[in-house]
Amino acid sequence: MKLKLPDSSKNWISLVGATIALITFSMIVFLFIITSVTHSGNTYLGLIIYVLLPGVLFIGLLLIPIGMWLKTRRDRRRTEEERKGWPVINFNIIQHRHAALVFAIGTSVFLMATAVGSYEAFHYSESVEFCGKTCHYVMQPEFTAYQGSPHARVKCVDCHVGSGADWYVRSKLSGLYQVYAVTLGTVPKPIETPITNLRPARETCEQCHWPQKFYSRKLRTEKHFMTDEKNSEWDITLTMKIGSNLSALGLEEGIHWHINPNVRIQYKAIDKKREKIPWVRYTNLKTGEVNEYVDHDVKISKEELSKLETRTVDCMDCHNRPSHNYQPPAFFINNALTKGTIPKDLPQIKFAALEVLAKKFETTEEAHKAIATEINQFYEDNYPDVFKNKKELIAKGIKGIQESFSLNTFPEMKVRWDVYPNNIGHMEFIGCFRCHN
């Protein structure tokens, strides 16, 4: 039995669409087999297989019904005798040869231009500038904090997307919603964290920071300033027990013991920010030893506890603000005093700065005006001689406070230090004491 196609399918538009769809589908199958056999995780190849070619395939398939519809519509206006069969191409006719040549050259140029354009568009969408500046109003806090972070030389996509096509496609689908939210102004302020669909840290962080690496103890010096009249310095020097004292011991001791490959630490949190942890399980993968720890001060039934998500500790459970950290005022004022952008010769400048920075503002402009007004007023009321004779020093202090504020607080997006808990340490937030209570 021969396959008989409807008369409406016998038209140039449907024929071109079917040809495009067939060739594209063959390319997808071929490239998919190549990546499966070679186990290649190249993002560019994944883009072609999962994004670019399916788009071309869709267009080709779409042309088939469009051509059939147009031919059916055209045929209704003709008599049965006027209807024609399949188009005939005869290369003995010079017009046909010229038309075929033009079509071949034009198609080749179009496909090459499309390929180059798609590649460049992809390359731009993967750039730091695209991530940080395209949606400037929304992403300004993240982009600003990122530029001053230890990962400032690492591309956004290296952490947020990583290698491979699967997470690339997920990120673009997520990006479509973000474009929609920005367009309609429905982006939450501030952006909620932790991000539930963030790629696991073991697939991104550990590309550079692998657990098997030995991390020795680290000598750390911090400079603090008191809020007294002299802005007295208070220096702290301590040894951070990051790893074992001896490299031969590896990850048997220290803070990084939590990511020891021979140990699995799991926990359950009762809040979205993962700050309240009533249950922890320790498993020694070598010996099989298992210990469970329950916080009996948290009133929660066994049934409710069993329904909570069980997470395995990874980098992000402690280093939860590795690139987008918004420092508290006491911290960034200490840094500014150390650098000299805020003169420590001004009496009680830290106290005055913390007083004004404790307030909440609607806009950055409003904050800058309030800083200038209240610092001037503070010295006029409490230190009239300083206010009269050291106006330039006060102006420098005001500028330093404003600059530090703008790097860490973004009123338009309701972003400030106390919105995003930082689990490193236990100064402003409970951090380590979420589990070690």
Residue ranges and their predicted role:
Residues 22-35:
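Alpha-helical transmembrane segments of multi-pass membrane proteins
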Residues 160, 209-212, 319, 436:
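Helix-to-catalytic-loop junction in kinase catalytic cores
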Residues 293, 334, 340-375:
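Charged, amphipathic alpha-helical linkers/stalks
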Residues 185-206, 353-371:
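Electron-transfer interface patches adjacent to heme c in soluble/periplasmic c-type cytochromes
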Residues 308, 312, 316, 321-325:
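A conserved active-site cap/scaffold subdomain adjacent to cofactor or substrate pockets
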Residues 36-58, 64-200, 218-307, 332-341, ...:
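Sequence context of c-type cytochrome heme-c attachment sites
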Residues 4-21, 51, 100-104:
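Alpha-helical transmembrane segments and their helix-start/interface "positive-inside/aromatic belt" motifs
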Residues 357-403:
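Long, charge-rich alpha-helical interaction segments
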